[in-house]
Regions:
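A short, N-terminal "cap"/entry segment at the start of jelly-roll beta-barrel domains
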Residues: 1-36, 122-136
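A short hydrophobic beta-strand segment most commonly corresponding to one strand
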Residues: 36-39, 60, 86, 101-119
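Short beta-strand His + acidic residue motifs that chelate non-heme Fe in jelly-roll/DSBH
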Residues: 51-52, 70-71, 87, 93-100
Length: 136
């Protein structure tokens, strides 16, 4: 039986995807020791935008800090801290922070770790999907 666990996001090592975006897997199956809803903290640098993508499963964004635009197909939503965005399967989406001088931080929620391509990048680079700042 899996044990409960406290995760402090400040102690989770960010995975640097590129010079514009970093990602922290806060909650995932490996971390929890059982199947869970996956939670990721993403940081998009000021004056940047993501490349965008399409996923097979629903994804949910929660905006933590910063303001920006989230595009879902041809629809643009201006978002602020406290907003949620529901991204249905098959929807092309990206984040545009090019008009802002501050970082854009969001939490992403999805059902299975395999539905997020950064999971595989972490596994390839680290041999696992989660690291603390104290690990090499």
């Amino acid at each position: 039986m899996a044990q409960g666990r406290l995760i402090n996001s400040k102690n989770v090592k960010p995975f640097i995807c590129d010079e514009t975006y970093s990602s922290k897997l806060l909650i995932g199956d490996e971390v929890a020791g059982c199947e869970v809803i996956n939670v990721n903290e993403g940081t998009l640098e000021a004056r940047q935008k993501t490349a965008g993508g399409v996923h097979e499963q629903t994804e949910i964004y929660y905006i933590v800090s910063g303001t920006g635009d989230v595009w879902l197909d041809e629809t643009c939503y201006h978002v602020v801290p406290g907003d949620f965005i529901i991204i249905p399967p098959g929807t092309f989406h990206y984040i545009d922070n090019t008009m802002n001088d501050e970082k854009f931080v969001l939490m992403t929620f999805w059902s299975r770790q395999e539905y997020n391509e950064v999971y595989f990048a972490r596994k390839k680079a680290w041999g696992k999907s989660f690291k603390t700042i104290d690990e090499e």
